[in-house]
Each structure stands twice: as structure tokens, then as C-alpha cells.
């Protein structure tokens, strides 16, 4: 009887510890998720010896220039005073701690689909970063695009909050690929054409066109991938070199260096399987 009580007590203690560890988040998983989400590219200034995640990267768009903010845990310049709930609100609902909406240059229309566990682990990882006191640079937007209240109207038309729900009737690998593409990888933010309001064109998901900075981006539906073998495409997403020896434009080159080359072979295979499953759309 005593032995059974001891075993039960140990099990209870272990279960409590495991639950607490889960609640705190897995920083190792979070680091992988940060790579899958491309956080480094948007939140690190484009210059030699820039401090990672300290902000300053410029995104030039037809609406003006947006600057990625400091997301290190510095108490004044970064996210040091944020609670996990503030982070979840930003990612899931596109709102600042004070309730104001973020401009959708921050791809929360995609990040809203990240599930609760991944948000927790990603937050845990961001808390481990070295704090930087680099002040976040204000956006430089043309009239009237700097009026933040207009984002609320934009959201009514183009934003649906909520985590990704696995689609029935398709394989686990395709669902995993859909999650990587639609949520973490936010591929549609660049590869889906947009209307004059900056909203994604309905029915044209991943069909290519002009990216956020006005440059041509390719069609990722089977129409655009028909000349690629899976093995060649996977090699390209790791090495940044096509089977013909070509290299991509700098923007995609950075995505490959910081994101796709860091994915596991299983996740790369899932990503490709999902893209292959999409309906082919014309360029």
C-alpha cells in the first residue's frame, strides 16, 4: 500500500511538472518555429552585423515604407513588458497591447492560423533572445494610409481570425503542408496577388503576380510548379540553386537562407505535397 501511495505521489508530481513545463513553452521548438515563420528576415536590419530581431528592416510598398519592430525582450525598446496574452493577441487578432490594430504589413492574417501550442513555444523562444535597446523606427506612410483606424475597416473585408483547422478528407502530410504554407510560412502574403486596398484577391491564392514591394513573384500552384520535380524543388528550397544552376531573386534567396533551408526534410515534403494538391490557377 505504501509503495502504491509513493508511486501515485511521484506520478502526480511528474504530471504537475510536465504541465508546468508545457505551460511555459518549449524554447527549442520555438526556435524552429521562428525559423519556419521567417521572423529573422522582417525583424533584423538589412546590414552587416545587425542585431538579430532588433528591428529596422524596411518593407517598401505602394502605401509607404514599413519598418519591422524590435521583438527582443528589452523592457522599453522591445517586448520586455509584454505578457504572453499580449503576444497571442498580436498574432491571433492583429492588435497591440493598447487595443489598436497593427497594419497588415505584419502578416497576422496568416499568423492568426498558428495554433495555441506553437504560439506558446514561439513566445518562450523570443523571451530567450538577448535584449536590444534599439528603438523601433516609425513607419513612413503616405496619406491616408497612416490612419490606423482604417485598418479596422480593412479587417472587416480581409481578415478572419482563428487557428488553422485541418481539412477533412486529406492526408496528414498535406494538412501539415497547408499549416506551414498558410500559417507559419505565410507564403500567401507575397505569392497571392492583391487588390488596390492591399487585400488578397479572392480565388487567386498563391497564383503569383506582384509582391508587396512591387516585384514579380511566381505562381506556386501546380501551374507554376509543373516543370519542377519534387526532388528538384526540395533541393532548391534547401540550396537556393535550381536544377539549371540559376539562383532566385534576393528576397526569395533570403527566405531560403533563413527559413526553408532550416526546415526538416519531412516538413519540406509536406509543404510540396500541399502545393501539389492545390487547384492549378493561371498566372
Regions found by a protein language model. Give the residues of each.
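Extended, well-folded interaction surfaces typified by the phenylalanyl-tRNA synthetase beta subunit core
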Residues: 134-151
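Bacterial N-terminal signal peptides that target proteins for export
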Residues: 1-9
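Electrostatic cytochrome c docking/interface patches
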Residues: 19-35, 152-182
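Electron-transfer interface patches adjacent to heme c in soluble/periplasmic c-type cytochromes
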Residues: 58-89, 109-119, 204-244, 254-268
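The canonical Cys-X-X-Cys-His
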Residues: 30, 36-46, 87, 122, ...
Amino acid at each position: 500500500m505504501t509503495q502504491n501511495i509513493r508511486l501515485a505521489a511521484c506520478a502526480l508530481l511528474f504530471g504537475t511538472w510536465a504541465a508546468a513545463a508545457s505551460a511555459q513553452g518549449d524554447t527549442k521548438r520555438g526556435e524552429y518555429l521562428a525559423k519556419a515563420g521567417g521572423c529573422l528576415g522582417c525583424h533584423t536590419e538589412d546590414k552587416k552585423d545587425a542585431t538579430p530581431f532588433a528591428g529596422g528592416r524596411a518593407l517598401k510598398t505602394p502605401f509607404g515604407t514599413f519598418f519591422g519592430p524590435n521583438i527582443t525582450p528589452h523592457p522599453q525598446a522591445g517586448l520586455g513588458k509584454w505578457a504572453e496574452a499580449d503576444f497571442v493577441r498580436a498574432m491571433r487578432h492583429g492588435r497591440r497591447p493598447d487595443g489598436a490594430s497593427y497594419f497588415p504589413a505584419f502578416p497576422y492574417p496568416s499568423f492568426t492560423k498558428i495554433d495555441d501550442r506553437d504560439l506558446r513555444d514561439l513566445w518562450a523562444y523570443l523571451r530567450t533572445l538577448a535584449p536590444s535597446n534599439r528603438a523601433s523606427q516609425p513607419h513612413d506612410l503616405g496619406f491616408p494610409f497612416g490612419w490606423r483606424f482604417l485598418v479596422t475597416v480593412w479587417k472587416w473585408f480581409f481578415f478572419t481570425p482563428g487557428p488553422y483547422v485541418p481539412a477533412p478528407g486529406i492526408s496528414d502530410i498535406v494538412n501539415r503542408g497547408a499549416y506551414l504554407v498558410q500559417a507559419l510560412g505565410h507564403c500567401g502574403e507575397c505569392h497571392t496577388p492583391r487588390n488596390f486596398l492591399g487585400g488578397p484577391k479572392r480565388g487567386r491564392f498563391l497564383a503569383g503576380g506582384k509582391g508587396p514591394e512591387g516585384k514579380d513573384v511566381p505562381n506556386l500552384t501546380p501551374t507554376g510548379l509543373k516543370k519542377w520535380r519534387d526532388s528538384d524543388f526540395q533541393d532548391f528550397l534547401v540550396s537556393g540553386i535550381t536544377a539549371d544552376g540559376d539562383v532566385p531573386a534576393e528576397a526569395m534567396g533570403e527566405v531560403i537562407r533563413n527559413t526553408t533551408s532550416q526546415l526538416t526534410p519531412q516538413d519540406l515534403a509536406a509543404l510540396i505535397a500541399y502545393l501539389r494538391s492545390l487547384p492549378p490557377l493561371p498566372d
